[in-house]
Amino acid sequence: MLYHETFDVIVVGGGHAGTEAALASARTGQKTLLLTHNIDTLGQMSCNPAIGGIGKGHLVKEVDAMGGLMAQAIDHAGIQFRTLNASKGPAVRATRAQADRALYKAYVRDFLENAPNLTLFQQAVDDLIVEQDQVRGVITQMGLKFHAKAVVLTVGTFLGGKIHIGLQSSSGGRAGDPPSIALADRLRELPFRVDRLKTGTPPRIDARSVDFSVLEAQHGDNPTPVFSFMGDRTHHPRQIPCFITHTNEQTHEVIRNNLDRSPMYAGIIEGIGPRYCPSIEDKVMRFADKNSHQIFIEPEGLTTHELYPNGISTSLPFDVQVQIVRSMKGFENAHIVRPGYAIEYDFFDPRDLKQTYETKFIQGLFFAGQINGTTGYEEAAAQGLMAGLNASLFSQEKEGWSPRRDQAYMGVLIDDLSTMGTKEPYRMFTSRAEHRLLLREDNADLRLTEKARELGLVDDARWARFNQKIDNMEQERQRLKSTWMNPASTGIDELNQLLKTPMNREASGEDLLRRPEMTYDQLTSLTAFAPAIDDLEAAEQVEIQVKYEGYIKRQQDEIEKSLRHEHTKLPADLDYSDVKGLSNEVVLKLNTAKPETLGIASRISGITPAAISILLVHLKKIGMLKVGEENA
């Protein structure tokens, strides 16, 4: 049966990737359909109730800068906000917030239901309609056919999903939800490389059974940080603390004594788990010299008693989970509400993707989220936004777009995935970016909002706010540049109290702000340089841009040098065995990867600078490079 409407873009899956993909496509004016097996689980936080963190918070800010939803949702649902690495440099500072699961999901659903150009429909997808290597639509569980010019798959852990608790396993996409078996089988028929990954979740605890009097409280920051560039502290609900406990030798003994009942150690689970979020049994075995591990006790919301013990993800049997939980301080009488479990699922080698998230083998088919081997809500949201945008551009027969590595963590993400692939769940860190001084949380809008506006992703309200911030920054920098003091000026004693060495020559406000001991707040508290501007974001930019101006300029110069051939196109049909001088290894890797540009080719493992030089000469020979450009 054929559905009575056709669409420009269909998004399959309503998690963090799917919601951003659907909204991005709809924001650009394309007629978009979001298909989900259950409308009630749109925007659901399947694992930990938190958004952000090192590297992850940067992605959330970038999604927000391009008009995405995640930052606004957490601003309205966050029950504890903190800035991580607050004492370090601005490049590695990151925002993190605990979420009220119910508030978060409700905000996402409300936003989706009221989004122009977006239709929601509840049906699981079993099949793709593919004709002559181009996707034409999808077929649902009930045999309903939907036609579209582009399809985005954001299916999370549902493809061939298998849940493990102890030595027992069952099919499932997550606890309480069925897996997607038919679609997984269909995708395995297509020419993609497929493998298995694993992730897990801890048991949930009833807070009424916990003795908080013996636990260490961890409060949020005051004043609270804000995630969205359009956000405000007044959006935040009531703030509450998290708590900290620890595992101990008794905990570890319980785990060691029951490893034979672990599906991981019994060889039942084939998939590789996340390196940076290991199960408690993995931690105990890998770090055998440690007799304790810190566990963060995170509330799941303001209207529930459920707690999320971050750090004891496990697939051990339920009776062992009870022993583990009750061995920890404050949890001696704890009641488990939901057991922890591991889940295994299919993922597809992201090296089979273009930088637009379109698959190399099926035109118009895009993948985003855990299907690409990533882990985390934030990584999923970033991929979803970019895949939705590029699906929209594809449906309009326009050229796709993705940011470079030096423009955004979103650029680092797709570049890492599409050039190197991954053997384990991929998580973003600031250390993955070569140019992280330029890729800060605080300047995500300055890097991306103008481009997002050009692409149709940014509405008038956000655009007006962005331009007001730019104006405020420029005016304040000009004011500080043109305001001077000298050793004979009125107020010099007030200034010298803030300086390590007294001022002995004339200096502008910007000169003084460059001093390590001087902050913008201190400078503008002085009579000569008062008042500070009301726009706190603009004030922060003024301080960072002035203090780090030399370092920023140096990094920008390095980027310019490295970009000489970043976008030099490589022919899609080029047989690299025809390129004289390339080694057999390089030929094999290039013919397998089929990189779109020289920049991408240069980042494939084993591709040497010499090989790039040979390719430049070949491109010149076949007329795809201007004379002299190979030496540029």
Curated annotation (Swiss-Prot):
The gene is mnmG. Keywords: Cytoplasm, FAD, Flavoprotein, NAD, tRNA processing. It is found in: Cytoplasm. This is tRNA uridine 5-carboxymethylaminomethyl modification enzyme MnmG. Its main location: cytoplasm. It comes from Vibrio vulnificus (strain YJ016). PANTHER family: GLUCOSE INHIBITED DIVISION PROTEIN A, PROTEIN MTO1 HOMOLOG, MITOCHONDRIAL. NAD-binding protein involved in the addition of a carboxymethylaminomethyl (cmnm) group at the wobble position (U34) of certain tRNAs, forming tRNA-cmnm(5)s(2)U34. Belongs to the MnmG family.
